[in-house]
């Protein structure tokens, strides 16, 4: 069946500030569940100037303990892989993220875009679409999808709030 979560936010800060803040966002005391983010690959396309990055995030397992009775869910950490393409010429950064930990049981995809806002070049537009489909947990599939939808919806709001806080701390009052 699967679930989907979507978000949109306009940050009243220039693209460069938002992208730099995003790439340096974690770890932060504002989000205790993200333990680390490690860049495992980075290269620049000499023809286009597009910077490609692959990063691995290590996060606490936040699945409730009553669901962790299922052996496949009994892990301390969850690993996410994020790939990003930063094009400073067009002022667009595209990201694709998926879960490595439960890849054989679930498909978790998140696609995000940061781009210069068409309304105001000093602003940055953020859009995100995420989907989760759980197939390998039998009767728990729907229960886990419902939990995932609630968790992801909350997580998107929290992530946006963290970005707003970091941008205010690093860049001061937003541009209008």
Curated annotation (Swiss-Prot):
Gene Ontology CC: mitochondrial intermembrane space
PRELI/MSF1 domain ranges (all copies): 1-175
Listed Pfam families: PRELI (PF04707)
Membrane-spanning parts: none
PANTHER family per UniProt: MSF1/PX19 RELATED
Protein name listed in UniProt: PRELI domain-containing protein 2
